[in-house]
């Protein structure tokens, strides 16, 4: 039931989005020190027509991308069972696999398929996940595979998987002097990219609503920045900020009722909140310095933002009720683009040290700071809804790409694009 509900949200959110050809391609660059060996056996199928997707291959790629698992190559498998009764656990012990994912696919009427799967513990020779099945259409095979990946990941790590989530990002294609900007949405693995909106002027700061049904972003018109809200299911777009001067950096509140944004209509960039239903605007900061890049705390009680009120740009926290402001970051030459993990434990920033911009993680309890990346010109971090990974924009071989790093800094991979530069990533919430 949960899978069908999430699938419905995903499908309806994408009805009015046009197709895009060039997808992001994952290149894993490092993983955890001790990987968990797991075999994802090709799912059994007795039909005569070709399947839309290789379910097992997608699950295997998802688990490998997490940096926590070491999939057993298919070419090494001694057998390929599709149900537990056919499993010879000795085969998998010889391959030193700790777990095995098996499954079978059955064709149903009306172009539907039933996908069954199990997760088996090789050592105990017992199921971790007993046989479970989901019914999907041909177009939803990738969704089914990501769902299975999420289940396996959660069962073996205790953390909810984020393979079924999506990402927003902006590409700049064509002539570098006059590029075409495209706001695109894709699966978290870069597959199935689709264009949400395109423009000959810049598109910036895409942000998801907490139910995943709407997005906010900045799009320039006649060289002036304007803020829009757009429904993914209908394509309906609403311009919600077109004040004189700067209109920028929209960020949804956790309850989805407000946007934090940056306006300079009163002659200086300040943080405001906008009640989406009533259009009531409230000024939250009042300082001669530049206040920008707001991001809500998970409980909605505070907003972290960038300000140069202390000299160089650093991160400050604004109490939403009292409007009291306090400084949060003290290490590094500067810190910008703050994002907080869903549990509120860590703050992710872009930190500059000795001329280098890297993604940094600050423990909000201890104050300890860890530099997570070694890439070049890192910017725009966005955190997965389970708090395990940070996606960010960087430069690789002279081209703007997206990259991902785990919050412990051990797992890293790139998502290069075949077309143009890629910037401004935004990781979706879980679809409810």
Swiss-Prot record:
Q: Cellular component GO terms, alphabetically? A: periplasmic space
The protein's matches in InterPro entries, at most eight in alphabetical order, are given as: 6-blade_b-propeller_TolB-like, PD40, Tol-Pal_TolB, TolB_N
Please give the SUPFAM superfamilies that the UniProt record associates with this protein. TolB, N-terminal domain (SSF52964), Tricorn protease N-terminal domain (SSF69304)
**UniProt keyword Cell division, yes or no:** yes
Q: Which compartment or compartments is the protein found in?
A: Periplasm
One BP term from GO: cell division
Signal sequence range: 1-22
Q: Which Gene3D superfamilies match?
A: TolB, C-terminal domain, TolB, N-terminal domain
Keyword Cell cycle listed? The answer is yes
What superkingdom does the record give?
Bacteria
Q: Where the protein is mainly located, per its record?
A: periplasm
Q: How does it assemble?
A: The Tol-Pal system is composed of five core proteins: the inner membrane proteins TolA, TolQ and TolR, the periplasmic protein TolB and the outer membrane protein Pal. They form a network linking the inner and outer membranes and the peptidoglycan layer.
Stated role? Part of the Tol-Pal system, which plays a role in outer membrane invagination during cell division and is important for maintaining outer membrane integrity.
**Of which family is this protein a member?**
Belongs to the TolB family.
PANTHER family, per database record: PROTEIN TOLB (PTHR36842:SF1), PROTEIN TOLB HOMOLOG (PTHR36842)
What protein am I looking at?
A: Tol-Pal system protein TolB
Source organism: Marinomonas sp. (strain MWYL1)
Lineage, uppermost ranks: Bacteria, Pseudomonadati, Pseudomonadota, Gammaproteobacteria, Oceanospirillales
């Amino acid at each position: 039931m949960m899978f069908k509900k999430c699938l419905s949200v995903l499908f309806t959110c994408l009805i009015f989005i046009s197709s895009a050809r060039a997808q992001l391609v994952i290149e894993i660059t490092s993983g955890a020190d001790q990987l968990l060996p797991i075999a994802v056996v090709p799912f059994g199928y007795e039909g005569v027509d070709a399947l839309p997707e290789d379910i097992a291959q997608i699950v295997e790629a998802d688990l490998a991308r997490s940096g926590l698992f070491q999939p057993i190559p298919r070419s090494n498998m001694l057998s390929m069972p599709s149900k537990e009764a056919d499993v010879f656990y000795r085969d998998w012990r010889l391959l030193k696999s700790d777990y095995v994912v098996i499954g079978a696919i059955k064709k149903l009427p009306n172009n539907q398929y039933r996908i069954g799967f199990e997760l088996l513990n090789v050592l105990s020779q017992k199921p971790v996940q007993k046989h479970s099945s989901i019914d999907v259409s041909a177009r939803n095979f990738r969704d089914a595979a990501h769902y299975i990946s999420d289940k396996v990941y959660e069962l073996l790590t205790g953390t909810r998987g984020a393979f079924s989530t999506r990402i927003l990002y902006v590409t700049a294609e064509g002539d570098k002097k006059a590029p075409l900007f495209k706001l695109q949405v894709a699966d978290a693995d870069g597959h199935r990219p689709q264009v949400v909106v395109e423009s000959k002027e810049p598109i910036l700061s895409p942000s998801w609503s907490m139910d995943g049904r709407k997005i906010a972003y900045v799009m320039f018109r006649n060289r002036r920045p304007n803020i829009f809200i757009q429904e993914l299911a209908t394509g309906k777009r609403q311009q919600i900020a077109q004040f004189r001067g700067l209109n920028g950096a929209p960020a949804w509140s956790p309850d989805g009722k407000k946007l934090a944004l940056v306006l300079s209509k009163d002659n200086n960039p300040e943080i405001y909140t906008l009640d989406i239903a009533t259009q009531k605007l409230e000024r939250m900061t009042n300082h001669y310095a530049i206040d920008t890049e707001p991001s809500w705390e998970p409980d909605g009680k505070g907003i972290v933002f960038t300000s140069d009120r202390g000299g160089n740009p650093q991160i400050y926290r604004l109490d939403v009720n009292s409007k009291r402001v306090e400084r949060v970051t003290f290490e590094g030459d500067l810190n910008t683009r703050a994002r907080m993990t869903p549990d509120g434990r860590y703050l992710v920033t872009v930190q500059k040290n000795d001329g280098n911009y890297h993604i940094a993680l600050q423990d909000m309890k201890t104050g300890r700071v860890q530099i997570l990346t070694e890439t070049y010109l890192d910017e725009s971090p966005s955190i997965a809804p389970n708090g395990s990974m940070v996606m960010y924009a960087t430069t690789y071989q002279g081209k703007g790409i997206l990259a991902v790093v785990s919050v412990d800094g051990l797992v890293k991979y790139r998502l290069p694009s075949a077309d143009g530069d890629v910037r401004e990533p935004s990781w979706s919430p879980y679809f409810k």
